[in-house]
């Protein structure tokens, strides 16, 4: 997304006079990181040529505003809701945060289909005993997969009584294989899987099932339905829709979600998910045990909360709120901070 930060400036140089909006899907860096860029002021000045800038989270918007106040002269900020107004010289733009989402109804309905039920049956045939812990990520260093594998290894070390009663299914979707660092990451992941399976595998039980390919939609939803625990622990993520997809597809409402506090989804789902620091291997290990031992009533209570949040703030809400921000006449038309994601 950062490739498009100065697109508005380029468009206006060509004579474009219509309003231009921009949405940043990735996190906006905090001041101490952004300050290191040689072109920091130029980037911010270019972004001020947009009429509306949208971010995923309140934290991202705060980071951007802090950078504006530090590197752009005479900036004033008005408003205190979901959408603010920023003035710098003769420019006035709107800055909002709009957590992107999914089509909740589509996932929920498809998860209840016969096709997905058949996929779930085959998964149960392949992993007939114990609970399934699911990780689904594209191949990327930001996803924290090696940390996650180490956390699962720690869990197995601490809880030998649960061997044969729990299995981690780690799906890795191929990405950027032509870049050496990604190929190195793949090798690291596969070596870790091999080491852990080598230590703990017993007759009739392999602790980690590693899948390196893209899944079809029915396959993916089949895993969402069968997994009692979703382990979503990116080191940093703009949003992470896997967490929302898992909630929408959990038709029995018995799943537990372990979620990185550094995922953009965390503020929205924190009342139902078990939040963890993905760098803290022991904390994630303990979270796996907490999720494994959680009683069914608490699972349902937590999942219902998360499903309600995702259903209310779905992809159509995201589109409508962004479009409203570009056309509404008054900042008071927008909900106060905390309505979308508690702070």
Predicted regions and their residues:
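Catalytic cores of carbohydrate-active enzymes across secretory and cytosolic contexts
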Residues: 1-343
């Amino acid at each position: 997304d950062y490739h498009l930060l100065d697109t508005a400036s380029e468009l206006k140089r060509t004579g474009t006079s219509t309003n231009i909006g921009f949405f940043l899907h990735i996190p906006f860096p905090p001041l101490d990181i952004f300050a290191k860029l040689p072109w920091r002021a130029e980037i911010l000045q270019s972004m001020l040529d947009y009429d509306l800038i949208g971010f995923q989270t309140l934290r991202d918007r705060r980071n951007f505003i802090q950078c504006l106040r530090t590197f752009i002269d005479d900036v004033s900020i008005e408003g205190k809701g979901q959408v603010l107004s920023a003035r710098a010289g003769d420019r006035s733009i709107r800055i909002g945060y709009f957590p992107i989402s999914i089509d909740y109804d589509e996932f929920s309905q498809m998860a209840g289909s016969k096709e997905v039920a058949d996929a779930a049956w085959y998964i149960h045939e392949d992993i007939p005993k114990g609970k399934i812990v699911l990780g689904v990520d594209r191949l990327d260093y930001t996803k924290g997969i090696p940390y996650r594998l180490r956390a699962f290894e720690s869990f197995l070390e601490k809880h030998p009584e649960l061997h044969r009663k729990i299995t981690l299914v780690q799906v890795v979707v191929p990405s950027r294989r032509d870049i050496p660092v990604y190929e190195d990451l793949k090798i690291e992941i596969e070596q870790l899987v091999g080491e852990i399976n080598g230590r703990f595998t017993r007759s009739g039980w392999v602790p980690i099932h590693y899948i390196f390919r893209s899944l079809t939609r029915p396959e993916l939803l089949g895993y969402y339905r069968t997994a009692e625990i979703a382990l979503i622990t990116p080191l940093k993520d703009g949003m992470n829709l896997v967490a929302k997809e898992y909630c929408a597809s959990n038709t029995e409402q018995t799943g537990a979600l372990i979620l990185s506090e550094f995922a953009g989804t965390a503020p929205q789902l924190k009342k139902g998910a078990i939040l963890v620091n993905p760098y803290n291997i022991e904390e994630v290990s303990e979270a796996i045990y907490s999720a494994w031992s959680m009683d069914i009533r608490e699972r349902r209570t937590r999942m219902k909360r998360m499903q309600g949040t995702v259903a209310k703030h779905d992809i159509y809400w995201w589109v409508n709120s962004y479009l409203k921000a570009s056309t509404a006449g008054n900042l008071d038309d927008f909900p106060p901070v905390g309505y979308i994601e508690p702070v």
